[in-house]
Design a protein with these regions (language model features):
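Cysteine-cluster motifs in flexible loop/terminal segments that predominantly coordinate metals
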Residues: 27-59, 185-194
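Glycine-rich phosphate/pyrophosphate-binding loop and the adjoining helix
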Residues: 47, 129-194
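Short Asp/Glu-rich motifs
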Residues: 30-32, 77, 142-143, 176
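A short beta-strand-loop structural module common to alpha/beta enzyme folds
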Residues: 17-27
């Protein structure tokens, strides 16, 4: 996973874009309990795994890349738990709204497209434009040493970074030109069972 991120970072650095990598794979991440404490306090009730710090940093970020290894044909459980809590506790997605997002999946063989689909759901519900590349945002390899050998995958990461840069610059140019964001209607909350 880091090989793909590092390939993108090279492009970001070359274009003067600051990045920060936050790894969640090496520590336990609690899942969202939907206790709604964050709705009252603005912070998740769990405070020891970096989610609240990430949500705070997200306010100032211009774009996001969420990358995951693929386990059993889906993203890692940790990234799901992290993103569920980050998005749920971020004040109606305000920290993410109208900022480009990209999902990246790394696998030995299968499950990458299902993983990308799952991660892209976060972007859709938060009104985030989704960045794509010249192929699906995936790299293949069993080990970190294998990933750079996936020439098409590495090229896809470089092009993805270029597309993210372009999108972020377009949004910045729009702000400077006075183009307002859409006036989103207040969301209705409808249950299927009445």
């Amino acid at each position: 996973t880091m090989a793909a991120i590092e390939e993108m970072e090279k492009v970001f650095r070359a274009e003067g874009i600051e990045t920060e990598v936050i790894q969640v794979g090496g520590k336990p991440i609690a899942d969202c309990l939907q206790c709604n404490v964050c709705g009252k306090t603005g912070k998740c009730v769990f405070t020891d795994d970096g989610v609240n710090e990430f949500v705070e940093k997200a306010k100032d970020a211009d774009g996001f890349v969420f990358a995951t290894p693929v386990y059993f044909a889906h993203p890692s459980g940790r990234i799901f738990d992290f993103l569920d809590r980050a998005f749920y506790s971020s004040n109606g997605y305000e920290n993410f709204k109208f900022k480009p997002g990209a999902a990246v999946a790394i696998a030995r063989r299968g499950g990458t497209t299902a993983s990308l689909d799952a991660l892209n759901k976060y972007f859709g519900i938060a009104q985030m434009p989704t960045a794509g590349s010249t192929y699906w945002n995936m790299v293949h390899g069993l080990t970190a040493e294998d990933a750079p050998k996936d020439e098409e995958g590495m090229q896809t990461m470089r092009n993805l970074a270029k597309n993210m840069i372009w999108m972020m610059r377009c949004f910045e140019a729009g702000k400077k030109a006075g183009v307002p964001y859409p006036d989103t209607e207040k969301q209705f909350c409808t249950n299927f069972i009445r």
